[in-house]
UniProtKB/Swiss-Prot annotation:
The keyword DNA-binding does not apply. It comes from Halothermothrix orenii (strain H 168 / OCM 544 / DSM 9562). This is Transcription antitermination protein NusB. InterPro entries: NusB-like_sf (IPR035926), NusB_fam (IPR011605), NusB_RsmB_TIM44 (IPR006027). Involved in transcription antitermination. Required for transcription of ribosomal RNA (rRNA) genes. Binds specifically to the boxA antiterminator sequence of the ribosomal RNA (rrn) operons. It comes from the Bacteria.
Length: 134
């Protein structure tokens, strides 16, 4: 089974969402959750991209949230929909890690269409677009 980067981003979002709503965004819980996730998906033991995203977002969360707060006018990251804030964190982490900006934004918007509410794609696109202008 070929696993796409898009699928791995979705898996990362699902894991980050579950950790975020349970207030367990810490690296130990993330690693345990990734191991359990791989077992449930019957994936082999190699390291997957979604694990890099999950760990990277958790390790960089304060910096990522500062960026989000800077560009989300009149919104605090903690008051945003959990899905939206984690899509933004993933996209910003990937941009910081060298993924082309256009790819990161396109992926974030597509994932927002599938998992967010009707306003999520526009909201996410706007914040990401503002953040790269600087």
């Amino acid at each position: 089974m070929k696993i796409t980067r898009h699928q791995e981003r979705v898996w990362a979002l699902q894991i980050l969402y579950s950790l975020d709503i349970s207030s367990e965004l810490n690296i130990q819980k993330a690693r345990k959750t990734c191991r359990e996730f791989k077992y449930k998906k019957v994936l082999d033991k190699k390291r997957y991209y979604f694990e890099d995203i999950v760990e990277g977002v958790i390790n960089s969360r304060q910096d990522l949230d500062s960026i989000i707060n800077k560009y989300a006018i009149d919104w605090d990251v903690e008051r945003m929909a959990c899905i939206d804030r984690n899509i933004l964190r993933i996209a910003l982490y990937e941009i910081e890690s060298g993924l082309p900006v256009g790819v990161a934004i396109d992926e974030a918007v597509e994932i927002a269409k599938d998992f967010g509410d009707s306003n999520s794609p526009k909201f996410i696109n706007g914040i990401l677009a503002k953040s790269i202008e600087d």
